[in-house]
């Protein structure tokens, strides 16, 4: 129920795509600003949470419940701007690895990038999180055995997507 991108159009497309496989039972939660105080799902009922959310912070009770779910083996898929949703929630940002926007700067951690075959952690000062216009770019899979990338080709073309930078 909250995002700076067109969630009303994109969320149903994701749902339809997943349901068409016949492998998923899907429940959808739409939470408006007015309803956030009552958003207290039982995350333990789900094998995976797919988030297309970028809105008001969750209640601390809901955050604790979600952290517990993840520590007990829960799974999370963060879609596009959902990496921006909770800039001040440390555990969430640890779950997603790198987030951006909403005032992120060097105090939130180093910039992390790949240079000459190595991961670089750059402590330079400055704001973080941006992207240009959607474009095609090559994705190179460096960890082929990781559960997220297992089965993907070594290289593939990402078609018309925003390439995040300064993370």
Where are these regions (language model features)?
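ATP/pyrophosphate-binding catalytic subdomain of soluble kinases
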Residues: 140-167
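A glycine-rich, often tryptophan-bearing local segment used as a flexible ligand/cofactor-contacting loop or short
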Residues: 56-150
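Helical hinge/lid and interdomain linker segments adjacent to catalytic or ligand-binding clefts
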Residues: 3-86
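A broad, low-specificity signal for short, low-complexity segments enriched in glycine/proline
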Residues: 10-12, 39-40, 134-138, 166-167
């Amino acid at each position: 129920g909250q995002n700076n991108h067109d969630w009303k159009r994109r969320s149903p497309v994701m749902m339809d795509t997943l349901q068409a496989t016949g492998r998923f039972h899907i429940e959808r939660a739409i939470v408006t600003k007015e309803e956030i105080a009552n958003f207290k799902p039982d995350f333990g009922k789900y094998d995976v949470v797919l988030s297309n959310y970028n809105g008001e912070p969750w209640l601390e009770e809901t955050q604790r419940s979600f952290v517990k779910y993840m520590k007990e083996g829960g799974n999370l898929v963060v879609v596009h701007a959902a990496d921006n949703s909770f800039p001040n929630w440390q555990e969430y940002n640890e779950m997603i690895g790198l987030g951006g926007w909403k005032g992120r700067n060097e105090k939130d951690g180093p910039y992390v990038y790949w240079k000459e075959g190595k991961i670089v952690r750059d402590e330079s000062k400055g704001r973080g999180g941006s992207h240009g216009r959607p474009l095609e770019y090559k994705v190179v899979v460096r960890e082929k055995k990781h559960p997220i990338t297992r089965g993907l080709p070594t290289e593939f073309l990402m078609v018309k997507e925003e390439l995040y930078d300064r993370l």
